[in-house]
Amino acid sequence: MRIILHLDMDAFFASIEERDRDYLKGKAIVVGADPKEGKGRGVVSTANYQARRYGISSGMPISEAWKIAKEVEKSKKEKIYFVAPDFGKYQKVSQNIFEILKKYSPKIEKASIDEFYLDLSFLKSFFKAKKVAQEIKREIFEKEKLTASIGIGPNKFVAKIASQMKKPNGEMAILPAKVKDFLAPLLIREIPGVGSKTEEKLNQMGIKTIGDLRKLSLSKLKSLFGKRGEDFYQKARGIDQSEIVVREEIKSLGKQITLEKDTLSTKVLLEKFTKILKEVFEEFKRSEFKTFREITLILRFSDFETKTVSKTFKKPLSSMKDFEVQSLKLLLPFLDQRKNPKKKKIRLLGLRIKNFDEK
């Protein structure tokens, strides 16, 4: 019998900022790009639950979040605080949580910076697994002053849905015999891979819930969606064979930024590019890697045309100087006639490194 635990930290970035800044205690918080008085061009990384009440959510344009904040401030007399992200700090807290979890299972998958799967099958009891979940939540709060939501199920799919149902700061265990009843009333969009177009197509057929989806045969789903149809058929029945990935290999490190204003100013672009260089290299130095052999430049023009240029090196790189020199060789042709003959302004800059050797 498989017993899988899914742990999702609650409003992770915003909760860390609230913990670390006294003036944010109990306030509505948005972590993301600088809103620039409503003219910012980035997005919301995380909004805490107080901010979500007003419709602010992750991925929303920061300018839209700012407009909502101003309306709330005017009508509700409540201030929404905007905070710049500190990803280095968040990564450190994530690692602290990972160290806590290692005491509870030898098989852990770090699905993202704030999301983990643990294999608790060795306990052979959902009752014991729920006790472990409560102990994990207690220890995380004791050591990090942060809350988490936990779902437990016979597979990753069910466990993750269960954790989302009990946010924030809750836990839920779904026994194998209860899986179909648990899933039946949920909307089909809860199934991974069911996006808005797929949902619309199924809704037109009268299929709105996972229970409805079970009425369709495997052959019908495959005829409608090809190979994905087989996965939908399995998920609708609560079947998920995906394994816990103990160590997801880091394939690349990088950063990209959307500029405040489209530009072809060499001064502005080099200033921003240097900042990206430093941040990527600092992340590399904090990693378990010793060298890298490939650099990729990502560049987007004002007309949204995107260019990606990579260079692989026979001799591995490890110094900031080499990284800077080689990266500039990729960028500079786009600042003049060589690779930008139409003199198009640049909207986005990014760098990635890969092909690592470990320390």
Language-model region placement:
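Short Gly/Ser/Thr- and Asp/Glu-enriched loop/turn motifs at secondary-structure junctions
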Residues: 111-115, 153-156, 290-294, 344-348
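DNA-contacting surface of Y-family translesion DNA polymerases
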Residues: 6, 190, 198, 203-346, ...
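Catalytic palm subdomain of template-directed nucleic-acid polymerases
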Residues: 118-137, 206
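Short acidic, glycine/serine/threonine-rich loops at helix termini
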Residues: 16-18, 42-45, 158-166, 244-247
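Residues that scaffold, gate, or flank divalent-cation-dependent active/transport sites
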Residues: 1-113, 117, 236
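Long, highly charged, low-complexity intrinsically disordered interaction regions
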Residues: 128-187
